[in-house]
């Protein structure tokens, strides 16, 4: 085989391997995306333009029709005995009502009032604060995933927010709510990235709970705790991709945003 023919075949093979990725990214151009989460998502701003947030770089590569973030700094999945439906609170700190559930409620309210296009893709990136603040979220790991899915949907769906306090229960509660209201939307769960502020075993326990809930609900899960550029061991030695061991700097946000665009493109169902 001549060098010319070999080069042509290698080029053809490369294009064949590249085509599914390009096709997947192209499909995103018609998608309206909504992102829920905590501070690393909130850093990108409501319309995903902040360079220190991964969402800005995600949009740059994923190129959806629209992308809006409802994330809040300090947000958790888990609830407390005082958690209530709350559309108004806008704090950047841990609080009873600064939870993913209320981000969902704001999304639903905005869609009902014509302020937000119904999303085809919903991404939820949370869990850092659930692992970080065990005293304020004491019941985070109080229930196993198996226990959280024992109650029939017909009963579980009627529970009120303050009665759903463990991480496993809340992930089920929030995701099934989204599935009822937006039945055609694809939901992707992102586990939290590693952090120097959180013992690795505790963070991994939170991430594993989220991942197992995703499996139970047949949702795609991206394991940021295992795959992202942020390593707690490396950040303890020197700040490479974070400003403080938890929150991404611009380079960390860029790498993570591009990585998430590629990973989510690979599981896109549209």
Model-based region annotation:
Residues 125-129, 172-207:
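Active-site segments of SGNH/GDSL-like serine hydrolases
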């Amino acid at each position: 085989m001549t060098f010319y023919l070999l080069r042509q075949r290698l080029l053809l093979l490369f294009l064949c391997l590249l085509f599914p990725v390009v096709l997947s990214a192209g499909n995103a151009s018609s998608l309206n995306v909504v992102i829920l989460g905590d501070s690393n998502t909130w850093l990108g701003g409501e319309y995903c333009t902040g360079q220190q947030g991964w969402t800005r770089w995600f949009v740059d590569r994923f190129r959806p029709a629209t992308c809006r973030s409802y994330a809040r700094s300090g947000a958790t999945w888990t609830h407390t005995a005082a958690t209530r439906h709350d559309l108004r609170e806008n704090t950047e700190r841990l609080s009873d009502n600064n939870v993913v559930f209320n981000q969902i409620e704001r999304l639903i309210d905005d869609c009902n009032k014509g302020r937000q296009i119904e999303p085809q893709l919903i991404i939820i990136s949370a869990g850092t604060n659930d692992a970080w603040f065990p005293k304020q979220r004491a019941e985070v790991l109080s229930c196993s995933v198996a226990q959280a899915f024992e109650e029939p949907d017909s009963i579980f769906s009627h529970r009120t927010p303050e009665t759903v306090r463990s991480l496993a229960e809340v992930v089920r509660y929030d995701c099934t709510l989204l599935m009822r209201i937006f039945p055609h939307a694809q939901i992707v769960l992102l586990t939290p990235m590693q952090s120097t502020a959180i013992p690795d075993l505790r963070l991994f326990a939170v991430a594993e709970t989220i991942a197992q809930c995703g499996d139970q609900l047949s949702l795609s899960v991206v394991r940021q705790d295992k795959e992202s550029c942020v390593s707690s061991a490396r950040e303890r030695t020197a700040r490479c991709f974070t400003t403080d061991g938890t929150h991404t700097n611009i380079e960390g946000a860029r790498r993570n945003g591009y990585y998430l665009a590629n990973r989510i493109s690979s599981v896109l169902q549209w």
